[in-house]
């Protein structure tokens, strides 16, 4: 089966994404079971799920890295990426979405849309990924299908169109109404393989009729022929509905909603049918866009195995047996093992050792990967996440991925002197795999610092150091990644002159510095050759290097723009080095006049608490300098939304547990940087000295 060639139209590259614990990995496990990839179903709470292949994942029961796997259903090849739902690992989601053609979002039927669902949805909007929704855990206490559909419309502004309705809920969830075919499926056994297709039960005919009308209206909106038939009261066939739905989904105009219980094996085969019927193939999406490396001219590549090669390395992983694996999506052309490809981002040729298709962590070697396929490459030396691999006669650079900056850091040291080098190598490998993880040395203290997206993120990094790389280490207290910025528009000079026998040094520039929205902008406004062109990049470099350490407390400076307005040079003594130093001097002089302030990460926090504890929890958030944004009731609990400075959130989980007797839970994610109050700023400066 696996060796059969499938035409591109029968490919589906999809991601499965959700909030933590919505049942995403369980759903993927069931898909693999039904498509014949696994013979025994793995359970995440038993620590045996096939897709969760790192030891930490099996222990914690959560998915950290996005495993990629290929399976087959109804004569289609489905490539699935299971992405993590925990906010600290959004980088994995971002990477996966960049290379997928469609996504299935899984919701928990008792909670509907949750904070991480919103984050993932926004990321998918960014890449215009067509989506469908599977409302899972219909068998659980408090399951509410229509409430969940409502949250899709209210919180995500999605045009959510149910294609199914559940028959019963909680313990009595026994089947699914198919609104497209206008019939019902009743489940007879626990494996979900024995099911009866029957008529819609009497007591549900009215609601089914109402929702089928809504479905027809939704497809009529995207298909004029159906609109005419609908208005004239003509019968619309199942095939016509399916075709229109497919077009609506691919155009991002309709989000179909299905339901089921992956754990109880209900609704999974219908979900697979819907993936095949409504999700796009590589041929249905726009040709991939990129730029010509030398001219910067925009170009596109078609999804065609005969076209020149264009592929994107979207993830680097280290495999204990074969070393570095580069997970890659082939957009056009064909990649063959043993051949050379051109890495257009690095400007280097790379040799492809072997090509493998992945099934979670089992590998199947192949001779080639064609347009539309996902696979992993063994043997690349210089390729990192986001690099384009192409044909050196037809170079192209595909749009890269943008990753958020880390917001939390901790100091780390090996327990033994001998472990220092080993730790350095291990940290470099981990940083190569994960663009949101950074490691650097604090120049003042000489300590090694690791920085990431949250406490869990860094915990798992430390865990991997111990397990995979056998490095025992001590970890300091988490520190907030503060930044600095400027509030005034100022002009400043930087002049570096040195005469000490032999050739001197001369660099001189005038800059204007001002606040801006972006991280950093450099604008060369020199006219009349006051500074020769070849020295301009050196000034820019000098400013960027100096901005890594601000004047308030030595934190990186962001949200500022520099305009280079004037300067002078010396025919003999001027050099790149002299202008680089002049640039950094001008930056420091400008900072001292520009009313610099300290910024701190502000986190978007969502706390779910039983009503009786609400007063206590809100009081506690206020005492942490939090700003309450709103509250929403949800099935016997309240959802409190607030912005709270990260520095006030350390150890919050313990406080919340004691204030709610273990019944409250929360999620938080980085939202923006904001100014630190004067009293806190003085405290931070005091601690840095």
From Swiss-Prot:
Is GTP-binding found in the keyword set?
yes
State the Gene Ontology terms under molecular function. Answer: GTP binding; GTPase activity; translation elongation factor activity
Where do transmembrane segments lie in this chain? none
Question: What keywords does the record list, in alphabetical order?
Answer: Cytoplasm, Elongation factor, GTP-binding, Nucleotide-binding, Protein biosynthesis
Q: What is its main location?
A: cytoplasm
Q: Which residues form a coiled coil?
A: none
Query: Which residues are GTP-binding?
Result: 18-25, 82-86, 136-139
Q: Which InterPro entries match?
A: EF-G-like_DII, EFG_II, EFG_III, EFG_III/V, EFG_IV, EFG_V, EFG_V-like, G_TR_CS
Its BP terms in the Gene Ontology are: ribosome disassembly
Q: tr-type G domain location, by residue?
A: 9-283
Q: Which GO terms describe its cellular component?
A: cytoplasm
Tell whether Protein biosynthesis is among the UniProt keywords: yes
List localization entries. Cytoplasm
Function noted in UniProt: Catalyzes the GTP-dependent ribosomal translocation step during translation elongation. During this step, the ribosome changes from the pre-translocational (PRE) to the post-translocational (POST) state as the newly formed A-site-bound peptidyl-tRNA and P-site-bound deacylated tRNA move to the P and E sites, respectively. Catalyzes the coordinated movement of the two tRNA molecules, the mRNA and conformational changes in the ribosome.
Q: Which NCBIfam families match?
A: EF-G, PRK12740.1-3, PRK12740.1-5, small_GTP
The family assignment reads: Belongs to the TRAFAC class translation factor GTPase superfamily. Classic translation factor GTPase family. EF-G/EF-2 subfamily.
How is this protein named in the record?
Elongation factor G
